[in-house]
Amino acid sequence: MPKILEFDESARRALERGVNRLADAVKVTLGPKGRNVVIDKKWGAPTITNDGVTVAREVELEDPYENLGAQLVKEVATKTNDAAGDGTTTATVLAQALVNEGLRSVAAGASPILLKRGIDAAAQAVSETLLSRAREIDERGDIAYVATNSAQDKQIGELIAEAFDKVGKDGVITVEESQTFGMDLEFTEGLQFDKGYISPYFVTDPDRQEAVLEDALILIHQGKISNLAELLPLLEKIVQTKKPLLIIAEDVEGDALGALVLNKMRGTLSVAAVKAPGFGERRKAMLQDIAILTGGQVIAEEVGLTLENAELDVLGKARRITVTKDTTTIVDGAGDQSEVNDRINQIRKEIEATDSDWDREKLQERLAKLAGGVCVLRVGAATEVELKERKHRLEDAISATRAAVEEGIIAGGGSALVHAAKTLEGDLGRTGDEATGVAIVRRALVAPARWIANNAGAEGNVVVSRIAELEPGHGYNAATGEYGDLVAQGIIDPVKVTRSAVQNAASIAGMLLTTEALVVEKPEEEENAEGGHGHSH
């Protein structure tokens, strides 16, 4: 495939145009008065959203050079979303401001390498400042504020606070679609571990990239499964039950994996396979936890059980299993509650007996998984479009709340960044182009606050100047149009979200400024559309 190349200033300008086009579409969603974006879908109803990362993911530009710029910013949004579950729009706005300011300096003759060094140092300093100003949260009211802020919906905030109340900060909260209107919360005994599906062919919901198994059987195997002949007798019995199957094993490979994928593709058997969590002795213990919770048995040579002679009664059962690329959640296992309680007490005794901090931490994780349970938030709406949008907001709000519990909170509304910019006023003692890099970050940090104000119909630059005069923790409440103590008013952001946004934006901006050449595939020549028929005029 032939390539085309672009160099120097024109390459960077093309990237900048792509960054601007994507960021302009995303930043209209920022703040309590952010607008919606309607996204056309090839199939089904269009999506209406005010979630930055959803907008970013949909953008593909026609010009290949501009598209590279857009993809880089998309990376900022996605990385921030992965790390903190929110803050994608803030990260995009920051990246755009850094790129625009930075390219201006490069065009004026500054060294991109030194600029990048200054930008990185400034991002690190801002990140540390934000952390030092963070306030820990444990109050239910604070949790409700964070969730309300993320979802822009008080009802969602209250529900999530209640969910965290029930499962604690280590517990699992999942979101399911409901047939009724409104939202409700259900607490079920369940367990989640950090292993996802072995093959993406097991996915049942392509939109969300998940495998969902309802009323499923669970095969728990301590070793590897690679030989199809060993697995076949049990598989045939399972197919007759017409129930979906989850396989948890050290690994599933070779013939066995091929046969499972083939059966899944043909619709003979709804199946998903995941690797067992943990290592060594801990893996054995966790498999035993899963077996007790689901009423199954671990198939292992040491207890005289092999795959060939296994019957259906060694399989566990659960009402619902959700497998993503990274996690597996088992809800409502069919295990005997008294046995589960015995297991929980046994783990508690082990925690008291151990003198290793690492062991204690891992045992507490197992305890939280067994005793904590799973909170299921059910969400319903009048239309499919509204349902997707509400579900998305709920998931974002849960991630943001987790981030807040982890690292604490700071004032929201972009004001924490305006105040953090003051730590960069002496250019961190840098000189020359490095000092310019620090100054670029200082100027870019006010962009989120400016856009929150602009979207609310206020004059952004005036609002930013006013915020800078206030003490840290105070700022502009875009919902009411007033200035005041934002933390007291419940306008707060998780510090992890804001830090991730700054660091990811700085990382991409630094890479973009130091770009000197672009290589893209040459577009194929369009065939003559008339194909030789008819007359040309």
From Swiss-Prot:
The keyword DNA damage does not apply. One of its GO terms (biological process) is protein refolding. GO terms for cellular component: cytoplasm. It catalyses: ATP + H2O + a folded polypeptide = ADP + phosphate + an unfolded polypeptide. CDD domains: GroEL. InterPro entries: Chaperonin_Cpn60_CS, Cpn60/GroEL, Cpn60/GroEL/TCP-1, GroEL-like_apical_dom_sf, GROEL-like_equatorial_sf, TCP-1-like_intermed_sf. It is an enzyme of class 5 (isomerase). The keyword Nucleotide-binding applies. One of its GO terms (molecular function) is ATP-dependent protein folding chaperone. It is found in: Cytoplasm. Keywords: ATP-binding, Chaperone, Cytoplasm, Isomerase, Nucleotide-binding. Its EC number is 5.6.1.7. ATP binds at residues 29-32, 86-90, 413, 477-479, 493. Its main location: cytoplasm. NCBIfam families: GroEL (TIGR02348), PRK00013.1 (NF000592), PRK12849.1 (NF009487), PRK12850.1 (NF009488), PRK12851.1 (NF009489). Together with its co-chaperonin GroES, plays an essential role in assisting protein folding. The GroEL-GroES system forms a nano-cage that allows encapsulation of the non-native substrate proteins and provides a physical environment optimized to promote and accelerate protein folding. Forms a cylinder of 14 subunits composed of two heptameric rings stacked back-to-back. Interacts with the co-chaperonin GroES. Belongs to the chaperonin (HSP60) family. This is Chaperonin GroEL 2. It comes from Thermobifida fusca (strain YX).
